[in-house]
Design a protein with these regions (language model features):
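Short, charged/polar N-terminal "headpieces" of proteins
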Residues: 1-27
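Active-site- and interface-proximal helix/loop "cap" or "latch" segments in soluble metabolic
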Residues: 22-84, 94-95
């Protein structure tokens, strides 16, 4: 199992993604979030073929569902990228490593 903890930023919402794959290709997700929009996104995601997902890139299942659910300021949410990376690791097409985005205002 792959577990990813995502802290989305200034909104303060937290998301935990648990991903399993019995065959290193087809990935089942369990997503818990304090954000109702991410919970709605999670409800749209069934099992995902990691090979198809990585090949489709921005047109894959995760990011397509994110575009449908996350509108306005939520369109910049980091959680969908975290879900996508978790699918990659669970499917064996990427290695686990921390990712981060740091935003600072330097006037």
């Amino acid at each position: 199992m792959v577990v990813t903890d995502i802290q989305a930023g200034i909104c303060g919402f937290r998301t935990t993604v648990r991903a399993r794959s019995d065959d290193m290709q087809n990935v089942t997700l369990e997503i818990e979030s304090t954000c109702e929009k991410i919970s709605a996104l999670a409800a749209k995601l069934g099992p995902i073929d990691a090979y198809q997902e990585i090949g489709a890139g921005f047109d894959g299942v995760v990011l397509t569902a994110a575009r449908q659910v996350l509108k306005g300021c939520c369109a910049g949410c980091a959680v969908p990228s975290g879900i996508f990376k978790t699918v990659q690791v669970a499917g064996g097409v990427a290695l686990p490593a921390p990712i981060s985005v740091t935003i600072e205002r330097k006037d």
